[in-house]
Amino acid sequence: MSKQNKKDWKKFKDEHKEEYKVENEILEEETDEESQHQEPALGHPSYTALEEQLTLAEQKAHENWEKSVRALAELENVRRRMEREVANAHKYGVEKLISALLPVVDSLEQALQLADKNSDPSMHEGLELTMKLFLDALQKFDVEQIDPLGQTFDPQQHEAMSMQPAPGAPPNSVITVFQKGYKLSDRVIRPARVIVSTK
């Protein structure tokens, strides 16, 4: 900077010294006011606090995930159980009706045994036909007659009324059937009442 420029600058500064002074005072006052009205600075959490919060959030997320998995499994179990119950209701829904009709079948069998073929052949034929129609109707609903004469005794399907020695029959075989049994699908709704042979 030349000497002339320095002098001009000094002169300019001196002339405007008062203005700068006033301006600086105003700026300082504004700065003081702003600093008084400023909100306190937000505190930033520490690294360890953030780490703890993250750990807690991860634990909560894991717990919620486990709960949702358990809820889904329970829902699937309920769905399967309901499907099984509906299938069983369709399969075994007629069980009470069949059980109520079995005494009618028993009565028809007894009437057939008592009816004499020779004295009234048409009545005997009518009873046989009625019995056949009845058993065919039961078969349509997956009902099967259990007539175990000569078979080995099965406690799942037979009810032993008594035991008797039978020389011509193998031991533990059915020698007499008092009342035939019935199965609905694979479920025994009435076991056959039988006499079983002994040694």
Curated annotation (Swiss-Prot):
Biological function: Participates actively in the response to hyperosmotic and heat shock by preventing the aggregation of stress-denatured proteins, in association with DnaK and GrpE. It is the nucleotide exchange factor for DnaK and may function as a thermosensor. Unfolded proteins bind initially to DnaJ; upon interaction with the DnaJ-bound protein, DnaK hydrolyzes its bound ATP, resulting in the formation of a stable complex. GrpE releases ADP from DnaK; ATP binding to DnaK triggers the release of the substrate protein, thus completing the reaction cycle.
Region feature (Disordered): 20-52
GO biological process terms held by the UniProt record: protein folding
Protein name as it appears in the record: Protein GrpE
Gene (name only): grpE
Molecular function per GO: adenyl-nucleotide exchange factor activity; protein homodimerization activity; protein-folding chaperone binding; unfolded protein binding
Subcellular locations according to the entry: Cytoplasm
Database matches in InterPro entries: GrpE (IPR000740), GrpE_coiled_coil (IPR013805), GrpE_head (IPR009012)
Lineage, highest ranks first: Bacteria, Pseudomonadati, Pseudomonadota, Gammaproteobacteria, Legionellales
Family: Belongs to the GrpE family.
HAMAP family with a match to the protein in the record: GrpE
